[in-house]
């Protein structure tokens, strides 16, 4: 059984502060802090019986008391006292009938030294003196005998005012900020469009939009030419070993060491079917090891024949059995596919078929139903023309057939509109002003082949009112 370790107790004063109020202090703590021990009691009782106050302990007098008088101890001067040390010594000598003196320091010289006596300036600084002292009321100090120090005071003070050099007028510059016009530029890029129009923003009418494209290597960069660098294929890796190889272990931890292990290469992968290990907790982290052949494989270390000692040690040769994997071969060429004789022939399907004959129809052939037109409407170029669907059922008014000319003498009839017809009709607006809209830097032409319709020709969707 081990001896119990002795722990040092805390300080007595720390214990007293914590255990006094709780009343759990040890018996020796309170008397020591409050001064009530046996030694303290003996000193108190001895002080009552013996009086040592007249010995002059701690008064520099070494216990020598003058005959018929007080000890030679002169108290220090208190605040406001004007009694000098020489006067105290003279009065003490007159009372005793003997001249009191200190060895090596005559009392006559103490009267002339201003270091131990109050000077004339110190005598004026008294509690009953006024708080403000004027310089005229302070008398001049006579100084020490044998020294003459002359002081000449001059009350005249010369003050010279220096005027700045240069002109009196100071230039004041007024700085006003410049008024800048507020400009706001917006740019929209359309993705996935089949046609890229050039950027031509020459007008600020209405709403504009543009498309910016930068072609690298095209004609837009100029005919500066360039250098064609052929693509070089570097050699592919020959083994499956990673580039960052782990550090090779040394000594018995290196399985490829011929000093500790007998290297036995094998080609039978069934050797590793039943892998065992003693304790995986203390095994090193798995890492890919590259063998001498430059290939990655499976390894196993074991002792086929060994002698076990009483302490649990094994004595015998260690074998390192390794199964190396195959290397990465060259690029595999096209392997012909063997076709069985019973395989049916494959049908050839062309990807692009030749177009057939189309039926040509003349545009001037209007048909017999539009031979006679009772009435026609014409609309000038730039007029607001919109298409509207007018249901025929339940419509009481009869509207004639409308025809619109598009800047040419040829007449293109529109579909007739009647009470029993549901085909769309042309509705001519009274407003002949067409808004100008710029799309991709070009003004929209309603009658050109840009495949863009004017917004006024599009049908407007009406919201369905729910009852």
UniProtKB/Swiss-Prot annotation:
The UniProt record lists the keyword Lipid biosynthesis: no
Pfam families reported in the protein's UniProt record: Late_protein_L2
Motif (Nuclear localization signal): 1-10, 459-466
Disulfide bonds: 19-25
InterPro entries, per database record: Late_L2 (IPR000784)
Superkingdom of origin: Viruses
Subcellular location: Virion; Host nucleus; Host early endosome; Host Golgi apparatus
GO biological process: microtubule-dependent intracellular transport of viral material towards nucleus; symbiont entry into host cell; viral penetration into host nucleus
GO molecular function: DNA binding; structural molecule activity
Modification after translation, per record: Highly phosphorylated.
GO CC, any one term: host cell endosome
Subunit structure: Interacts with major capsid protein L1. Interacts with E2; this interaction inhibits E2 transcriptional activity but not the DNA replication function E2. Interacts with host GADD45GIP1. Interacts with host HSPA8; this interaction is required for L2 nuclear translocation. Interacts with host importins KPNB2 and KPNB3. Forms a complex with importin alpha2-beta1 heterodimers via interaction with the importin alpha2 adapter. Interacts with host DYNLT1; this interaction is essential for virus intracellular transport during entry.
Annotated function: Minor protein of the capsid that localizes along the inner surface of the virion, within the central cavities beneath the L1 pentamers. Plays a role in capsid stabilization through interaction with the major capsid protein L1. Once the virion enters the host cell, L2 escorts the genomic DNA into the nucleus by promoting escape from the endosomal compartments and traffic through the host Golgi network.
Family to which the UniProt record says this protein belongs: Belongs to the papillomaviridae L2 protein family.
Protein's recorded name: Minor capsid protein L2
Naturally occurring in which organism (per UniProt): Bos taurus papillomavirus 2
């Amino acid at each position: 059984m081990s001896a119990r370790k002795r722990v040092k107790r805390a300080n007595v004063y720390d214990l007293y502060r914590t255990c006094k109020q709780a009343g759990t202090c040890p018996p020796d703590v309170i008397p020591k802090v409050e001064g009530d021990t046996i030694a303290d009691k003996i000193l108190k009782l001895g002080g009552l019986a013996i009086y040592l106050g007249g010995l002059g302990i701690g008064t520099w007098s070494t216990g020598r008391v003058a005959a018929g008088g007080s000890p030679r101890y002169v108290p220090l001067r208190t605040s406001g006292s004007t009694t000098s040390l020489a006067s105290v010594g003279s009065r003490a000598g007159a009372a005793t009938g003997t001249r009191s003196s200190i060895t090596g320091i005559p009392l006559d010289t103490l009267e002339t030294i201003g270091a131990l006596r109050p000077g004339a300036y110190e005598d004026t600084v008294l509690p009953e003196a006024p708080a403000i002292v004027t310089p005229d009321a302070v008398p001049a100090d006579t100084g020490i005998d044998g020294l003459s120090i002359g002081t000449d005071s001059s009350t005249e003070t010369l003050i010279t005012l220096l005027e700045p050099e240069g002109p009196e007028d100071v230039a004041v510059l007024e700085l006003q900020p410049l008024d800048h016009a507020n400009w706001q530029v917006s740019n929209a890029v359309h993705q996935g469009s089949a046609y890229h129009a050039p950027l031509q923003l020459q007008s600020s009418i209405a709403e504009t939009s543009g498309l910016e494209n930068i072609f690298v290597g095209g004609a837009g960069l100029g005919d500066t030419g360039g250098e064609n660098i052929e693509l070089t294929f570097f050699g592919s890796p020959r083994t499956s070993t990673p580039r960052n190889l782990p550090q090779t272990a040394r000594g018995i931890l290196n399985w490829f060491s011929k000093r500790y292990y007998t290297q036995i290469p094998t080609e039978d992968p069934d050797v590793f079917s039943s892998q065992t290990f003693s304790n995986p907790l203390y095994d090193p982290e798995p890492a890919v090891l590259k063998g001498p052949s430059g290939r990655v494989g499976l390894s196993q270390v074991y002792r086929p024949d060994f002698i076990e000692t009483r302490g649990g040690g094994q004595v015998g040769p260690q074998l390192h059995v390794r199964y190396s994997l195959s290397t990465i071969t060259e690029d595999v060429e096209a392997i012909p596919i063997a076709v069985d004789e019973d395989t049916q022939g494959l049908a050839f399907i062309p990807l692009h078929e030749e177009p057939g004959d189309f039926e040509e129809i003349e545009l001037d052939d209007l048909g017999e139903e539009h031979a006679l037109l009772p009435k026609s409407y014409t609309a000038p170029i730039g007029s607001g023309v919109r298409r509207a669907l007018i249901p025929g059922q339940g419509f009481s008014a009869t509207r004639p057939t409308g025809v619109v000319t598009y800047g040419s003498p040829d007449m293109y009839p529109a579909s007739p509109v009647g009470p029993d017809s549901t085909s769309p009709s042309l509705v001519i607006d009274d407003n002949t002003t067409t808004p100008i809209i710029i799309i991709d830097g070009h003004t929209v032409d309603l009658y050109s082949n840009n495949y863009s319709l004017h917004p006024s020709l599009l049908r407007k969707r009406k919201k369905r009112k729910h009852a």
